[in-house]
């Protein structure tokens, strides 16, 4: 265990429109160079498009997308006697959420639509329906863990 102090968890203020803490984390991850108002405009714009297309509550679509993208298990490298094994381990809740947010944003940024608002809304709808690059990333992670199940006894 480290002798240094671990970083204190900061309290995150819920977003003003929907009152959701996870949505604030999502906005903070989208934000570039401290431009929070731009990040808010992107997210709220995407939510408006989701509401029009899906005829559903955008927060519920967002939560469904996060649940469908969040990995249950991942592989971690572990050195044993000169060989490096990919050992499957369960993902902690906080890391699951962080990975889901990161993968959703990466997938949205890699899409070919015109604006980030359109890309994000399309990726959220795809992820909520178990499609899209973010869900594919989770499936790849699970596949890697399944392929390396033989090394699960090296878990720490």
Curated annotation (Swiss-Prot):
Q: Which CDD domains does its entry note?
A: uS7_Bacteria
Name the GO cellular-component terms: small ribosomal subunit
Recorded superkingdom: Bacteria
GO biological process, any:
translation
The record's section on Pfam families has: Ribosomal_S7
Q: Name one GO molecular function term.
A: structural constituent of ribosome
Q: Which UniProt keywords apply?
A: Ribonucleoprotein, Ribosomal protein, RNA-binding, rRNA-binding, tRNA-binding
Which InterPro entries does this UniProt record tie to the protein? Ribosomal_uS7 (IPR000235), Ribosomal_uS7_bac/org-type (IPR005717), Ribosomal_uS7_CS (IPR020606), Ribosomal_uS7_dom (IPR023798), Ribosomal_uS7_dom_sf (IPR036823)
State the oligomer form and interacting partners.
Answer: Part of the 30S ribosomal subunit. Contacts proteins S9 and S11.
Q: Main role? A: One of the primary rRNA binding proteins, it binds directly to 16S rRNA where it nucleates assembly of the head domain of the 30S subunit. Is located at the subunit interface close to the decoding center, probably blocks exit of the E-site tRNA.
Q: Which family does it belong to?
A: Belongs to the universal ribosomal protein uS7 family.
- Name the chain's protein: Small ribosomal subunit protein uS7
Q: Which gene encodes it?
A: rpsG
């Amino acid at each position: 265990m480290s002798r240094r102090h671990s970083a204190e968890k900061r309290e995150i203020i819920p977003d003003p429109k929907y009152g959701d803490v996870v949505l604030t984390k999502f906005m903070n991850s989208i934000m570039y160079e401290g431009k929070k108002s731009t990040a808010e405009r992107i997210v709220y714009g995407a939510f408006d498009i989701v509401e029009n297309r899906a005829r559903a509550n955008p927060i519920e679509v967002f939560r469904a997308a996060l649940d469908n993208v969040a990995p249950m298990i991942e592989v971690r490298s572990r050195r044993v006697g000169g060989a490096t094994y990919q050992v499957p381990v369960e993902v902690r809740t906080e890391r699951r959420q962080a990975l889901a947010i990161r993968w959703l944003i990466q997938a949205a940024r890699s899409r070919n639509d015109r604006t980030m608002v359109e890309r994000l809304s399309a990726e959220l709808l795809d992820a909520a329906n178990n499609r899209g690059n973010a869900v594919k990333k989770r499936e790849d992670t699970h596949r890697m863990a399944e392929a390396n199940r033989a090394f699960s006894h090296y878990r720490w």
